[in-house]
């Protein structure tokens, strides 16, 4: 099974590389690069596995005794393990460049098993390193390379997560032209549907759901808002479903109960068996330019496009607050349900 793998260089990327002799052969020389450990911990929580790939010139020769290397190397691994970080595999080439060996980066001989058996997902794997050879290795593996030094570890984290659990979706009909972009790990928020109150409600999903959300909609508002609201729901639902991918590791279930002067609740299950239970009554026919009857239709269309079972309920006096409560409750339940909390699929059937 293909995995999301980070192929990580060691010296100059994970730990500092001494400029004097380019060897970490004593404990005194062992220093971690800034933010390397917290970044790897966060990426681990998103299901990434780690593989170390390092060139160690002349390892095992009199100029670089293996026992000196291992003292610092084993200490580094012990520290990482104590923080919850372990490498699935460690590959080290001990040769000098002029030996023209088959294993030295950017050649791929050390990773032959990964290539032969397709053990890494090319779309969701990366090479992280500080040298041009690391970037060439990335190209040889068919994955994206992220160059440390040009990017900090925090910037590397953002680059990886922005490309992971993200999706774009476009829906074009004779009635509407809609573009949606979702990043479940957070990001830019920009919503323009031509219906101001609807924009305000969709913004609640982004802000309280902790997701990046960009929506642009050009619809036949000269007729009414029905097609725009319905098609935005369908496009948004399809985009969220696409961003979730195989759903491995997600919590799957979400429940929220925001309470102001009104009480709103939402229960959600990414079961791929769409269903909506909706209990809400409004005094007004419209909130701004949005018909209150379209709120139920929005969530109906959204639940079917997402493939979720959705239960929504609200009680209160103020119609604006009730509508906002429904969208906030949905957002909080969504945030809970899409959170990565394990390495497994949350289903005894093995599929959702």
Swiss-Prot record:
Coiled coil: none annotated. Gene3D superfamilies: HAD superfamily/HAD-like, Imidazole glycerol phosphate dehydratase, domain 1. It holds the Pfam family PNK3P. It catalyses: D-erythro-1-(imidazol-4-yl)glycerol 3-phosphate = 3-(imidazol-4-yl)-2-oxopropyl phosphate + H2O; L-histidinol phosphate + H2O = L-histidinol + phosphate. GO terms for cellular component: cytoplasm. Keywords: Amino-acid biosynthesis, Cytoplasm, Histidine biosynthesis, Hydrolase, Lyase, Magnesium, Metal-binding, Multifunctional enzyme, Zinc. GO terms for molecular function: histidinol-phosphatase activity; imidazoleglycerol-phosphate dehydratase activity; metal ion binding. Mg(2+) binds at residues 9, 11, 130. Its cofactor is Mg(2+); Zn(2+). It is found in: Cytoplasm. One of its GO terms (biological process) is L-histidine biosynthetic process. The keyword Hydrolase applies. Pathway: Amino-acid biosynthesis; L-histidine biosynthesis; L-histidine from 5-phospho-alpha-D-ribose 1-diphosphate: step 6/9; Amino-acid biosynthesis; L-histidine biosynthesis; L-histidine from 5-phospho-alpha-D-ribose 1-diphosphate: step 8/9. The active site is at 9 (nucleophile), 11 (proton donor). Zn(2+) binds at residues 93, 95, 101, 103. Residues 1-164 are annotated as: Histidinol-phosphatase. Its EC number is 3.1.3.15, 4.2.1.19. Residues 165-352 are annotated as: Imidazoleglycerol-phosphate dehydratase. In the N-terminal section; belongs to the histidinol-phosphatase family. This is Histidine biosynthesis bifunctional protein HisB. It comes from Campylobacter jejuni subsp. jejuni serotype O:23/36 (strain 81-176). The gene is hisB.
